[in-house]
Amino acid sequence: MIALTEDKRMLGYGVMTPYSNIFCFATTRRGGFSKGDYASFNCTPYTGDDAESVRSNQELLCNSMPQQPKELVIPFQTHGTKVEVIDEKYLNATSDERTAMLQGVDALITKEPGCCICISTADCIPILLYDRKNQVVAAAHAGWRGTVNYIAGHTLDRMRALY
């Protein structure tokens, strides 16, 4: 992995550098605003972290990207295999509808330019997929339950069915 920020809060995947139309990265716990158990660069709103710290971290994240995303999409993961597509239906949904759509989701797929799909991992595995032909990206959170229950396969199947 290569450092994308001076403080190493964002790391890039060297293997993805040939694909300049997408931006793949991982974040670390460094360089943010959160305190205590969530110190310091926690970007997920589904923890006990201070909401203002999370918003500040998300803003810092977006400002660290080469191009400001239109949308930062973070699901409420449950170590399952639910896959959600971030498309016009999602983008046109109300805030409450979006929250409901992201409940129990461990993989996201999108073809929408400017959408930054996110997953959270600690000791789990991030799976990042890219369909160059159709310009579709996916990110899946693979814990042991998701791995045993084929989250990678479910995500690929959904991508194939839609695109």
Give the positions of each predicted feature.
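Active-site microenvironment for binding and transforming phosphate-containing groups
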Residues: M1-Y163
